[in-house]
């Protein structure tokens, strides 16, 4: 008997555009013989499903159900395809825990923590062979903020909204004069900003997931961008970035990376599939942790689908494993 699945998408931030594109890919690739899928769009104004006749049906938030032509649709589980808030910061996960619905992503606590880049770095600190860039976390754009940063860190710097995604509001700062504008840009996206020293090296991203056989690591992807860094345009515009899967690493580097990201996944108590970004430092080859994305993109241009295909599996088979693991099958 088919399981009834809610595919949630949309969101409250600028990443909602990417969420909708991810949902299109997910919806096309979920096994229709095993799952009946309803795409639920979540916006600040409404949670709803649009049927084939373009009629909008509002979700009953009391139990996350639908009423279509006097038939109540209740879900067996949720595939979370919503980037940013409320799908990636723990809010939806907490709600689904309260109404008793299983879902494909990390739980509420892990989602909330990993959305905060500074807090995540503090938790993974101490994992063998994992390094983090020196950083300062700012909680307000005070007149002395730039001065505080320059006194504590060495240029060049990366300035990031602490709770953001898709590199929105992020800047690379090479001179002291560029810093105030970069801080202003980041604080427009978030009320916390993380400033990190730049690490010169090769940039990679790698998928890690928990399936029927425990924690598994996907092939890495090496990011070679023609831009200064892997920003929003580089991530979602064809031709700007070369994405090499599997990434070019020695056998020792690959084994070390797999061990480090598996331990980070375990320490952060992750579930479902996450994407961990890292740099192998130019001169030393050391692993520098950047961040973890608990609802990684699933668009045609996204990296997790590339990595899954590299293993010889179909994305349909992969989504089936994620759903069945979440449902406890």
Locate the predicted segments by residue.
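ATP-binding N-terminal substructure of ATP-dependent carboxylate-amine bond-forming enzymes
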Residues: 1-109, 113-115, 119, 139-148, ...
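Glycine-rich beta-alpha junction loops
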Residues: 44, 142, 163-165, 199-202, ...
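Short beta-strand-to-turn element immediately C-terminal to the catalytic PLP-Schiff-base lysine
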Residues: 138, 170-175, 208-211, 281, ...
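Conserved metal-phosphate-binding beta-hairpin within the catalytic cores
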Residues: 197, 265-298, 308
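Active-site "cap" helix and flanking loop/linker of ATP-utilizing ligase/carboxylase catalytic domains
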Residues: 222-274, 303-329
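Phosphate-binding site of ATP-dependent enzymes
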Residues: 174-259, 286-288
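Active-site nucleotide/adenylate-binding loops and adjacent lid/helix of ATP-dependent enzymes
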Residues: 5-9, 21, 72, 113-202, ...
């Amino acid at each position: 008997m088919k399981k009834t699945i809610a595919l949630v998408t949309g969101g409250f931030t600028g990443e909602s555009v990417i969420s909708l594109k991810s949902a299109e890919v997910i919806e096309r690739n979920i096994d229709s013989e095993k799952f009946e899928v309803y795409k639920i769009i979540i916006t600040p104004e409404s949670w709803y499903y649009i049927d084939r006749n373009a009629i909008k049906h509002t979700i009953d938030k009391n139990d996350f159900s639908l009423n279509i032509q006097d038939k109540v649709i209740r879900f067996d589980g949720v595939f979370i395809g919503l980037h940013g808030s409320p799908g990636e910061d723990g809010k939806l996960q907490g709600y689904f825990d309260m109404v008793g619905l299983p879902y494909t992503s990390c739980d509420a606590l892990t989602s909330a923590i990993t959305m905060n880049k500074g807090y995540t770095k503090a938790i993974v600190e101490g994992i063998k062979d994992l390094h983090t860039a020196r950083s300062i976390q700012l909680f307000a754009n005070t007149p002395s903020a730039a001065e505080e940063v320059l006194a504590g860190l060495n240029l060049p710097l990366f300035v990031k909204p602490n709770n953001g995604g898709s590199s929105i509001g992020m800047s690379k700062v090479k001179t002291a004069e560029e810093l105030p504008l970069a801080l202003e840009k980041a604080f427009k996206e978030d009320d916390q900003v993380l400033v990190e020293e730049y690490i010169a090296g090769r940039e990679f991203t790698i998928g890690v997931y928990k399936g029927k056989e425990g924690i598994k690591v996907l092939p890495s992807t090496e990011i070679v961008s023609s831009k200064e860094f892997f920003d929003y345009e580089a991530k979602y515009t064809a031709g700007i970035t070369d994405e090499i899967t599997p990434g070019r690493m020695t056998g020792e580097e690959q084994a070390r990376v797999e061990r480090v990201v598996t331990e980070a996944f375990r320490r952060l108590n992750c579930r479902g599939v996450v994407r961990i970004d890292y740099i192998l430092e130019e001169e030393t080859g050391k692993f520098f942790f950047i961040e973890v994305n608990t609802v990684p993109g699933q668009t045609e241009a996204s990296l997790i689908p590339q990595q899954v295909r590299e293993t010889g599996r179909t994305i349909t088979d992969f989504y089936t494993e994620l759903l069945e693991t979440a449902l406890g099958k």
